[in-house]
Design a protein with these regions (language model features):
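Cysteine-nucleophile active-site neighborhood
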Residues: 297-371
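C-terminal and late-domain segments of enzyme folds
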Residues: 111, 242-244, 256-266, 358-437
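Residues that mark the start of a beta-strand
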Residues: 8, 36-39, 245-247, 272, ...
Length: 437
């Protein structure tokens, strides 16, 4: 497509568990099979769904989050990544209007910010004509939300779909088709360390869903209903840089891969970015800043413990006063050891006088505001591990708040020029070196 207008849509639902991710993966693959270059986005801070998106579309997927990002930045990122696309699919998070406070930061607000319509995915199990009231409510709850169509999921039969189609028509929402009820179309658990091999094995899922979409969904009508002008790329403010020309090393492999592409873009503005793999026992490259992102170190404890060259080079760099920003799994890697679910300890870098453990796993999650050195940074927390309290350990710095400005129990540890904590930061609009000033 070379037109100034391209199909652009938000895939949203009434709640989590409705099948948004599964449908999105199938739609991305169906459009790719038509020869379209389709750009995907994900509402919210999630790292995992974008990996599924890339598997389905063949293109990197980008997060859009109105808690961590300014509206101007959201629009700029969206526009920049859609310039070479023939179609755009944005997957929502939770329910359409669910935000961190009321609907602030919701999928609906993101769609409004970038100016695209919404296609609802409705779980139709045990539903019939009464679904029309639900659709009418979603369409009219907010006048600035454009709900143009609906796809029904988990539909029992053509006769079942007839009731649903009539309900949608009477609610003023275009019925675009349905996905039949089947147990085969399930995305794996949210807490999985997906290797490249496992991702490739998952490739059958988008293929299967794409086949169902082509058979039961009017894709042409969907694309036509969502045709909108391609956004012009605004003039973006330059990423703040305190001293350009620096060297930044980023750990990136199967153990450490929770990375926002826009953060890498911000780091590139600071200087030269190089990547290395602790899992492959690669030594830390020469750098002025080491970025250890989150990921799944708990799935590779034996390999990381055996990677002595990588561990010792990081420990030596930190001991010499090198700057380190470590998030979640990256922080765990800096600890003396990580204990698995059975309590077995595996030696790690020993930069922090702490132990991380997977024992008694309990999910901790939420948005975070980090206030440090007179500045505010934003991010989110999502982890099952915990830090074993130590009598003597690192100092804790800064203050962390929830999205509702309540004090969060999340800690940021500091030792020399090492900053480590559970919060995954989004710093694409800020100078990451300012964290150390």
């Amino acid at each position: 497509m070379t037109s100034t207008s391209i199909p652009q849509l938000l895939v949203a639902a009434g709640s989590s568990g409705s099948g948004k991710t599964t449908f999105t993966l199938g739609l991305l693959r169906a459009l790719k099979r038509r020869g379209l270059a389709v750009q995907s986005f994900k509402c919210g801070p999630d790292y995992i769904d974008p990996k599924f998106h890339q598997l389905s579309s063949g293109r990197p997927s980008i997060n859009l989050d109105l808690f961590m990002m300014s509206p101007e930045h959201v629009r700029a990122v969206y526009a920049r990544h859609t310039q070479e696309a023939d179609a755009v699919v944005l997957e929502g998070v939770m329910g359409l209007y669910d935000g961190y406070v009321r609907m602030h930061g919701s999928s609906a607000e993101v769609a409004k910010t970038v100016g695209i319509p919404t296609v609802l995915l409705v779980d139709a199990r045990s539903s019939a004509y009464s679904v029309g009231a639900l659709l009418y409510g979603f369409k009219h709850f907010r006048q600035d939300t454009e709900v143009v169509g609906v796809v029904f999921n988990r539909v029992a039969s053509e006769n079942h779909y007839r009731f649903l189609r009539e309900a949608a028509e009477d609610a003023g929402v275009i019925p675009l088709g349905y996905i039949p009820k089947t147990k085969l179309l399930e995305v794996p658990s949210r807490h999985l360390g997906l290797s490249l091999r496992e991702l490739q094995e998952l490739d059958a899922l988008p293929e299967d869903v794409a086949a169902l979409i082509e058979k039961h969904v009017d894709v042409d009508r969907l694309l036509e209903a969502c045709m909108r002008p391609r956004p012009a790329v605004p003039i973006e403010e330059a990423v703040p840089t305190s001293a350009p020309g620096r060297k930044i090393a980023v750990a990136r492999d199967e153990a450490f891969n929770f990375i926002y592409e826009e953060n890498i873009r911000a780091l590139t503005a600071q200087g030269e970015v190089s990547f290395f793999s602790p899992l492959k026992d690669e030594a830390l490259p020469e750098c002025d800043l080491l970025y250890l992102p989150g990921g799944y170190p708990e799935f590779y404890l034996s390999e990381l413990a055996a990677a002595e060259r990588s561990r010792s080079s990081i420990a030596a760099y930190a001991a010499a006063g090198g700057r380190v920003l470590a998030e979640c799994g990256g922080m765990m890697y800096l600890c003396r050891a990580i204990r698995d679910e059975e309590g077995k300890a595996y030696p790690m870098c020993g930069v922090l006088d702490q132990e991380a453990t997977m024992e008694g796993m309990r999910l901790r999650l939420g948005y975070r505001k980090l206030r440090l050195g007179g500045r505010e940074y934003r991010g989110h927390e999502f982890h099952y591990s915990s830090i074993v309290p130590q009598e003597v350990g690192e100092e804790t710095v800064g203050e962390q708040l929830t999205a509702r400005d309540e004090v969060a129990p999340t800690l940021l540890y500091r030792r020399g020029n090492v900053l480590a904590g559970y919060t995954h930061l989004y710093f694409a609009e800020q100078d990451p070196f300012a964290l150390f000033s």
